[in-house]
Amino acid sequence: MKAFCAFCVVLLVFGSVSEAKFDDFEDEEDIVEYDDNDFAEFEDVVEDSVTESPQRVINTEDDEDEATVELEGQDEGQEGDFEDADTQEGDTESEPYDDEEFEGYEDKPDTSSNKNKDPITIVDVPAHLQNSWESYYLEILMVTGLLAYIMNYIIGKNKNSRLAQAWFNSHRELLESNFTLVGDDGTNKEATSTGKLNQENEHIYNLWCSGRVCCEGMLIQLRFLKRQDLLNVLARMMRPVSDQVQIKVTMNDEDMDTYVFAVGTRKALLRLQKEMQDLSEFCSDKPKSGAKYGLPDSLAILSEMGEVTEGMMDTKMVHFLTHYADKIESVHFSDQFSGPKIMQEEGQPLKLPDTKRTLLFTFNVPGSGNTYPKDMEALLPLMNMVIYSIDKAKKFRLNREGKQKADKNRARVEENFLKLTHVQRQEAAQSRREEKKRAEKERIMNEEDPEKQRRLEEAALRREQKKLEKKQMKMKQIKVKAM
């Protein structure tokens, strides 16, 4: 009963409210105005929601996904209540864009996305990865060394060229007065005088002279230090050496007698005795002092026989050797000159090397490496010594006993050589015979005609039998002579 009474009270209240509402509108115009105002209120609500939505997304501390879901829910509710929602959206899109509506939107940072990111940490760059000169010290050293090598190459090459030209200028007049041809480079078929040095490389210069009595020619070689090589320059700081001038005179066979003779520093003679074939065979004794002939203690003598020493050490030669002893490395006269010893892997050569009658001179340039162009002029008296030695070698002749002794020495050297090479020569002859037999057998086997092949075999057997018979006859003759 109580419930029924409560229900009746609710109905009465609802009816009174609705009646009061419709009493306010007396005519149809008021109803239309109410309807328009009613929709206007909802339009204000939509516009307020659009303008307030960015602030809600920015200021809220919740996730962006949740805020977006709430806004979409509100829009769907509004579309369900109003049938002309699409028309209103078209009107709002046609309205001009108002910049004041979004004022301050970009000024507020979006802190929601930063919360999910890790904090930024700044790592210190190691010192060896920084862009500083200390990081390129190795490259700097390499570039500096390369520049130093290039500069030393240019300076050293130019200095050697100046020294060579200074030597040639000071000796040119003397050479042209004694030789018809000075400076032939060998490029032309006919010998022509170029009047200049021939550069072999950066530290070696050659000069060929010919056209003089009693000699075929003279080769002058200026062997300077490798000043263009930086490593060689550094090595010379520890062990100084000198520039050298080497002169080789090839004599005519009829203008020089048979003897081997050398004079020079003791150290140089010992080295030559080990390296040169003729000095090691014909001058096997140790170098002897030249004090007997008035030579300084720094010089020694190697000679095949005493007669040669007596004949070569005249007053003028002793004068040259005494006054220029500091510049003389060695003086070597030989009719058996064949160069350095021949070293073969399979043993001794099967024949004696070819020999030439030769005069060799080796002079040291003053300065011990610190040479200047003016020092090259100091070698001019030594060139006079070379010219005098050529004439001296032509005039000097051994007596009868000396000639016989020289011939015995050469026969002894040849006999020793044949003994050393006898086994090798036998092996070489045996290998040649075997090769010949092998070729003969191959020729017989390759013959297609059986009859011709048989005849070739019979001929080979007959030759073998003849050889055996000859050997037996020789053995019988030897036995008869022995009896």
UniProtKB/Swiss-Prot annotation:
The keyword Acyltransferase does not apply. It is a single-pass type I membrane protein. Residues 60-104 have a biased composition (Acidic residues). Residues 1-20 form the signal peptide. Residues 21-135 are cytoplasmic. The chain crosses the membrane at residues 136-156. GO terms for molecular function: calcium ion binding; protein folding chaperone; ribosome binding. Residues 105-118, 430-472 have a biased composition (Basic and acidic residues). Pfam families: CCDC47. Residues 473-483 have a biased composition (Basic residues). Keywords: Chaperone, Coiled coil, Endoplasmic reticulum, Glycoprotein, Membrane, Signal, Transmembrane, Transmembrane helix. Component of the multi-pass translocon (MPT) complex that mediates insertion of multi-pass membrane proteins into the lipid bilayer of membranes. The MPT complex takes over after the SEC61 complex: following membrane insertion of the first few transmembrane segments of proteins by the SEC61 complex, the MPT complex occludes the lateral gate of the SEC61 complex to promote insertion of subsequent transmembrane regions. Component of the PAT complex, composed of WDR83OS/Asterix and CCDC47. The PAT complex is part of the multi-pass translocon (MPT) complex, composed of three subcomplexes, the GEL complex (composed of RAB5IF/OPTI and TMCO1), the BOS complex (composed of NCLN/Nicalin, NOMO1 and TMEM147) and the PAT complex (composed of WDR83OS/Asterix and CCDC47). The MPT complex associates with the SEC61 complex. Interacts with VCP, HSPA5, DERL1, DERL2 and SELENOS. PANTHER family: ADIPOCYTE-SPECIFIC PROTEIN 4-RELATED, PAT COMPLEX SUBUNIT CCDC47. This is PAT complex subunit CCDC47. The lineage of its organism: Eukaryota, Metazoa, Chordata, Craniata, Vertebrata.
